[in-house]
Amino acid sequence: MEKTLTIDGKAVKFKTSAALPRLYRETFRRDVFLDLNKARAGIKKKNASADDLPVETLEVIENLAYCMAKYADPSIPDNIYDWLDQFPTTAIYTVAQDILIMWNEEQRTLSVPKK
């Protein structure tokens, strides 16, 4: 799935597929499924704005957004810091919900179980 989202007035492409967990692991040496489970727990506890979320949760959102953007556009810098530098400090969190929705859509079961 590909989608273009606007971050601080800039159009940014994002892409998800079965390859994304591998890209995340290769980029950050971490498991995206474990990271997202922890992030979800932080979001559910707080149920608030980015200002109230734990730093670890915000970092997972940044990492996932970066991987999805890099996957959609390989010309994006290889360093996440260089990519994040083009946005104001909290701008990336404005698309966090869209990014998580894209991730969830990619993960849902496409066939109905027979039993």
Give the label of every model feature segment.
Residues M1-A11, R30-P54, E59, Y71-K115:
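Charged interaction scaffolds used for protein-protein
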Residues L20-P21, A41:
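Generic secondary-structure boundary signal with a strong preference for alpha-helix termini
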Residues K15-S17:
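Short linear motifs in exposed loops
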Residues P21-R22, E26-F28:
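N-terminal first-folded block
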